[in-house]
């Protein structure tokens, strides 16, 4: 439905709102795999199982796994010598891997395979002598892990302005990689700025932003013109969830991110005829459905899934956790 058609229909109270569900939404294959790794490790070895950082950036998921015996730590020093530790889906630096080995820890790596792909790119290109621009958010665990695949020669940029300030050693030996959960549109702008300033820059064979990030952003682009407010299910520290909220706002639709049903405020629905709902790649469908239940309790009259891509991606578990 076009925005013109939307404008022609008189808005009614929130009690008559229709909820449109973006497709796809919620868990991606990398998140599914990471959570299953923790659950399988708990089943096989028993609690406690230590996890370095949040396995994925979702408070609901972390709380659930903690209740089952997972212990989330910030540093490997918090893991007993000889204990079992799981690396989060965001990946870790080479230094963290070496520290785990030095402490004699049993390690299961829940790094998303699409993040590992970027790690391999970095290691290969540094070996070939390329200086590498990393497009990403400073301080994000994925960025720290990816930049930590090399001892030096990594340059972080977060914006087009950062590109203008870059000082590189040899423009002819320059490459770039990206964080997997960025805004597709903003990343394209940064890449364009890099290419304009460094025409010889070496590109990844395939874009580093993952399929799930792309698909969920495309789903919001499809949904936004049909609704008057967007609710994103996701935790504040979830990069991909934040990008969904920002995207809806850039498309001119008020957007809110929630972590629990109680955070949905009745006034968001006031006078709204259609409410859009999506969920970040680290948000479980059961949490999204609890938000739908909250919207129904506030008077939403119907829920309608939108058309969209059906994802069927899956990744194998690490050796030692696979079912024989």
UniProtKB/Swiss-Prot annotation:
Protein family according to the UniProt entry: Belongs to the IspH family.
Keyword Acyltransferase: no
Binding site for isopentenyl diphosphate: 57, 90, 140, 238-240, 282
GO biological process: dimethylallyl diphosphate biosynthetic process; isopentenyl diphosphate biosynthetic process, methylerythritol 4-phosphate pathway; terpenoid biosynthetic process
Pfam entry (one): LYTB
Catalytic activity: isopentenyl diphosphate + 2 oxidized [2Fe-2S]-[ferredoxin] + H2O = (2E)-4-hydroxy-3-methylbut-2-enyl diphosphate + 2 reduced [2Fe-2S]-[ferredoxin] + 2 H(+); dimethylallyl diphosphate + 2 oxidized [2Fe-2S]-[ferredoxin] + H2O = (2E)-4-hydroxy-3-methylbut-2-enyl diphosphate + 2 reduced [2Fe-2S]-[ferredoxin] + 2 H(+)
Keywords noted in UniProt: 4Fe-4S, Iron, Iron-sulfur, Isoprene biosynthesis, Metal-binding, Oxidoreductase
Top-level lineage group: Bacteria
Protein's pathway: Isoprenoid biosynthesis; dimethylallyl diphosphate biosynthesis; dimethylallyl diphosphate from (2E)-4-hydroxy-3-methylbutenyl diphosphate: step 1/1; Isoprenoid biosynthesis; isopentenyl diphosphate biosynthesis via DXP pathway; isopentenyl diphosphate from 1-deoxy-D-xylulose 5-phosphate: step 6/6
Positions of the catalytic residues: 142
Binding-site positions, dimethylallyl diphosphate: 57, 90, 140, 238-240, 282
Enzyme class: oxidoreductase
Alphabetized Gene3D superfamilies for the sequence: 3.40.50.11270, 4-hydroxy-3-methylbut-2-enyl diphosphate reductase, catalytic domain
Protein name: 4-hydroxy-3-methylbut-2-enyl diphosphate reductase
Binding-site list for (2E)-4-hydroxy-3-methylbut-2-enyl diphosphate: 57, 90, 140, 180, 238-240, 282
InterPro entries reported for this sequence: LytB/IspH
GO terms assigned for molecular function: 4 iron, 4 sulfur cluster binding; 4-hydroxy-3-methylbut-2-enyl diphosphate reductase activity; metal ion binding
Keyword Ribonucleoprotein annotated: no
Cofactor binding note from Swiss-Prot or TrEMBL: Binds 1 [4Fe-4S] cluster per subunit.
